[in-house]
Amino acid sequence: MKLFFFILVFIASSSPSFALGKLGHQVVCQLAFEHLSLTKQAQVSTLLNAIPQRHKHLINNYNYKKPNSPINFASACTWPDAIKRLEEYKTYQPWHYMNVPRDHIYIRANDCRKNCLPQAILKHQQVLAQTKSEVNWQRVQALLFLGHWLGDIHQPFHISFADDFGGNRVKFSHLTTKCKNLHWYWDECILYKGRNSKAKWLALLTAKWHLHPQPNWQTEQVWQWAEESFQLVKSASLSYCQLNNQYSCQKVADKIRLPENYLQQHQVIMEQRLLLAAQRLTKILTTTL
């Protein structure tokens, strides 16, 4: 059995990156949970307690914890990555992102009818809102998906171009980091703050929580969030896009060289995106649970 879970984790971690990394998801969901009312926190905890044992093991193995370790909301939000290579969940793989044609200028609601990240948020918010008093596996899954999707939609490369798989084919010619392409770099390596990165991110974002209050949840907001990420990913400093005179994005070389100050320059962008993701998740859960 231990070998079975090890293989699942290896497969999930060795494939191309299509999801914000563990650290980002944990930070978003822990911050959101901490800013819920005590009543809403209790409702989240009740749903987490209903996670089947098999899926608790999957979450813990994915996070390099002992199989029977307690599950909190931070670790539970990594569940959609822990299970996405399982046959029964393969249908959800495209839901982690939204890739558009290279000539796209902005994101609109009719750009995606199903099987993409904005629609995934709407779908699982609706499922979670149904039969609020019930504790069942369908609602538990919706909670875990929803927490995960809020992290993904705020990572700019999750709303990007189809012809290079959202930056997964844009590789580096010089970096020795474990993140071998631009999408992967923004999923994980851009969040690096040395030892205890998670604690540092939580402290930083907690201190800034009240500086940018967010409006109450409305369904049309998901397209605004996608548009925010899309415009960020098209900005010249990210080294992913060269705008032409028609404001569409020209493809960059398959291998690029990032400036030496790239991490310092752009980590502040992910700081803003993680904060917004957590605040907006808090608003959704407050309305939905």
Residue spans for each PLM region:
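Positively charged n-region of N-terminal signal peptides that target proteins for export
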Residues: 1-4
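Cleavable N-terminal signal peptides
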Residues: 6-7, 17
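N-terminal, motif-rich segments that launch catalysis or mediate targeting to/interaction with membranes
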Residues: 18-149, 156-287
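N-terminal signal peptide c-region/cleavage motif recognized by signal peptidases
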Residues: 12-16
